[in-house]
Amino acid sequence: RQAAKAKCRSVAILLPEGTDARLMAEGAIYGMHRPSGYKDQKPWPVEEVILLAGAEPAEADRGQLTAEGINLARELVEIPANDLGPEEFAMRAAQEGAAAGLEVEVFDETALAEMGAGALLAVGQGSVRPPRLVRLSYVPENPTSNDHLFLVGKGITFDTGGLSLKPPSGMEKMKYDMGG
């Protein structure tokens, strides 16, 4: 905040020995997050924070990756459902996945029908915007084991499940369901 007040565009922070470089990196990146631009706001002057992590650069890198992922999730949740429907979400997931070196597959309603995803298609019939399913896969070049790890998340851009059970004041928060 002090750097922003001073209108600094770049800030370097020397971390004292014993400082948790991962947490410092996370905090710096979380602090730089700004909403997606749907409200009038002054531009954030700080464009870059450099952490001089001494003996823990790998931990700082880990914190950076974690915080950037969380800020991406925050950004997606902030986008109104009329601007981020299933197709837009799938396109963004494909862009982010490809940039991270992942294999990306996007299944449209035809592919979903072919795979027998009737429940997903049935829920999608409640919208004029058809559903999408995104598969992001990481396949290492030289795997050291036959073990597999699966992470499953949902990118429901606006969850109307239980709509009749929610009070009117709860309607605006239904878009946050995609955040987990």
Label each PLM-derived region with a short phrase:
Residues 1-157, 165-170:
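N-terminal hydrophobic/helix-forming segments and targeting peptides
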